[in-house]
Swiss-Prot record:
Pathway: Carotenoid biosynthesis; spheroidene biosynthesis. Residues 153-225 form the PAS domain. InterPro entries: Homeodomain-like_sf (IPR009057), HTH_Fis (IPR002197), PAS (IPR000014), PAS-like_dom_sf (IPR035965), Tscrpt_reg_PpsR-CrtJ (IPR011785). The gene is crtJ. One of its GO terms (biological process) is photosynthesis. It comes from the Bacteria. This is Protein CrtJ. The keyword Disulfide bond does not apply. Keywords: Carotenoid biosynthesis, Chlorophyll biosynthesis, Photosynthesis. GO terms for molecular function: sequence-specific DNA binding. PROSITE patterns: PAS (PS50112).
Length: 469
């Protein structure tokens, strides 16, 4: 024996072994063996009886070696044989036999004879290993499908839970802790969802001890699905009613609890919500809800009628500046004032219609900042008819205009028009300052004047000292 554990045998001793016995030894040590001439022609095929019958591979004898393999395996074999093996050394390759009737993966140990270059290919059938690998791949694919199905179910569950308008809690009967809840329930309790997950339900809902509370809910869920328990939310001391549904999941009993307002409060809230919805849908004044950046979230039919819009879908998502005659200037004045003081009254402007028309309107705005996303509500009225009734009394009460009226018959028309122009100019500047909350930069934008021109006119009409006061 050599140092690496292999055995040495003299050639003379090996020659004393009969060829038939040597063939039996080779076939018993492998599944299939090929003897290939230097010209790459198969001279002999030896098959282990447990692997298959020799007739199955009889056609291989006399065939070219490359014809026995798939094109990829034949090319791989040629490339490796071009580089080796050296006589007395071997190389291992995994090759695939591709015949008309079958495909056979085999791992070959290839040895080259030192005398004439004859090749001996000793092969082991890789079909069992390939089948195991295929089963592993199928199992992996099945696991991935199960994982995707589980994710889909979890997504559907989460969407259903969050889309339900009622506050919902899922409570474990064994631990008395909150297993899950939707955002509506978290908002009603007055905490975040992360704070309430796995929190003891008895610490959030005050009424009875934990055991009595859960047993009472389970009893109601089993006997009267419409029954309810009145409890108090500890954080806000708010009265709520709790209805429950009992179910099992993963061996644990769970309660699906629906939180609702106490009856008296719920009746008042429901009435208010219903009346508000009716006012929005059927009111004669146009109503619009905006995001904080001026994007339209909702608009009623009166607004669609006022702007000649075809449908609410064509309005939602557009900037309200698209409907203002002064565009972004009007919108910035509106948003700045509403965000600063929370509301805006009697803001007069013009709305553009979808057919290049304009309507003079008066709008009021209110900011709802106590929501997750701040919302601005607008009430818009057509002021074309009201202008005539409002302007004349104002004109009669304005000292400058009364003086102009008294000039008729005592001054030329040119002088009267010049005096009127200055009065109207002063009134416009005062109105712009009032609308912008004395913000001169915004007033200049509103009047399409430069800041320098506005200051000149303020000094001209004595409004600088008035603003300082």
């Amino acid at each position: 024996m050599t140092s690496d554990g292999s055995f040495l045998m003299r050639r003379e001793a090996l020659q004393r072994v009969s060829p038939d016995l040597l063939a039996d030894i080779v076939t018993s040590a492998c599944d299939i063996a090929l003897v290939v001439s230097p010209g790459r022609v198969v001279e002999s095929v030896m098959v282990n009886p447990q692997f298959g019958s020799a007739e199955r591979f009889a056609a291989w004898q006399g065939a070219r070696l490359s014809q026995l393999f798939s094109p990829e395996s034949a090319q791989k074999l040629e490339n490796r044989l071009a580089d080796g093996p050296e006589p007395g050394r071997s190389l291992q390759l995994e090759l695939t036999h591709a015949a008309d009737a079958f495909t056979l993966p085999v791992r070959y140990t290839i040895t080259r004879s030192g005398e004439d270059g004859t090749l001996l290919l000793i092969g082991r059938d890789m079909q069992p290993l390939a089948e195991v690998q295929q089963q592993l791949v199928k199992a992996q694919l099945a696991l991935e499908r199960d994982y995707e199905a589980q994710r889909e179910i979890e997504t559907r569950y989460r969407v259903l839970l969050e889309a339900h308008p009622a506050p919902l809690l899922i409570v474990s009967m064994s631990t008395g802790r909150i297993a899950d809840l939707n955002l509506a329930a978290a908002a009603m309790i007055g905490a975040t969802r992360a704070e309430l997950i796995d929190a003891p339900v008895g610490q959030e809902l005050d009424g009875r001890r934990r055991g009595e509370f859960l047993e009472n809910l389970a009893k109601i869920a089993g006997s009267d699905p419409l029954g309810a328990v009145e409890l108090t939310i500890r954080r806000s001391r708010r009265k709520v009613t709790v209805t429950a549904t009992l179910f099992r999941a993963a061996g644990d009993r769970l309660l699906l609890c629906r939180l609702g307002e106490a009856e008296a409060r719920r009746t008042r809230v429901d009435d208010t919500v219903e009346l508000s919805e009716r006012l929005f849908l059927k009111g004669i004044d146009a109503m619009v809800f905006l995001d904080a950046d001026g994007t339209i979230r909702a608009a009623n039919d009166a607004f669609l009628y006022l702007t000649d819009a075809g449908s609410a879908a064509l309005v939602q998502g557009r900037s309200f500046a698209d409907f203002l005659s002064r565009g972004a200037v009007d919108l910035n004045v509106l948003l700045d004032n509403v965000k600063r003081i929370g509301h805006l009254r009697h803001y007069v402007t013009r709305l553009n219609t979808d057919f290049s028309g304009q309507v003079t309107v008066e709008l009021s705005a209110t900011l709802f900042h106590d929501r997750a996303t701040p919302t601005i509500a607008l009430v818009i009225r057509d002021s074309n008819l009201a202008d005539a009734t409002r302007i004349m009394p104002g004109m009669a009460s304005n000292e400058g205009l009364r003086n102009v009226m008294q000039m008729v018959g005592y001054a030329t028309l040119r002088d009267i028009v010049s005096e009127t122009t200055e009065i109207i100019e002063k009134m416009c500047i005062e109105t712009a300052l009032e609308l912008t909350g004395n913000n001169r930069v915004a007033a200049a934008e509103l009047l399409s004047l430069s800041r320098q021109s506005l200051y000149v006119k303020l000094r001209k009409f004595g409004l600088l000292s008035k603003d300082a006061e």
